[in-house]
Amino acid sequence: MGRLEGKSVIITGAGSGIGRAASLLFTKEGARLIAVDLSEGVKETVELVKQQGGIAEAVMADAGSEADVSGFIDRAVATFGKLDVIWANAGISGGLKPIAEQTVEHWQEILRINLIGPFLAVKYAMPHMVRQ
């Protein structure tokens, strides 16, 4: 029995990198996972989880969209009956261009994903977690 047996987890940015690695580690310890990403890589992550015997569902969603965040949190609760962990891991960078060549629109997108995304995750997860 793993340390996270029976826990339900959402990880955003689960399509690659740290999000994928965390997804594999959490489910190896028995967590049930809703893996979220905008990229098709999230489906690969879920396949890897299932290959190691884990339970996971892929959700292609925008971690900076209020409607998407509310939706994937509600889906986790509907699927697993509860929500124990939300890891707002999704993030993007400014790229390698000098700042003088970057646009305000690009920086607004960075803030939407990296700052507003975690706020939305907590905002919509908290009521479920407090009830538990």
Map each language-model feature to its residues.
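Flexible N-terminal pre-Rossmann segment of NAD(P)-dependent oxidoreductases
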Residues: M1-I10
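Conserved glycine-rich cofactor-binding loop
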Residues: G15-S16
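Conserved glycine-rich Rossmann-like NAD(P)H-binding loop of the short-chain dehydrogenase/reductase
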Residues: E29-E44
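The beta1-alpha1 cofactor-binding region of Rossmann-like NAD(H)/NADP(H)-dependent oxidoreductases
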Residues: M60-F72, V104
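Conserved NAD(P)H cofactor-binding loop of Rossmann-fold oxidoreductase domains
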Residues: N89-G95
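Substrate-binding pocket helix/loop in short-chain dehydrogenase/reductase
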Residues: K97-I99, H106-Q108
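A short, exposed helix-loop element centered on a Lys and neighboring polar residues
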Residues: V122-K123
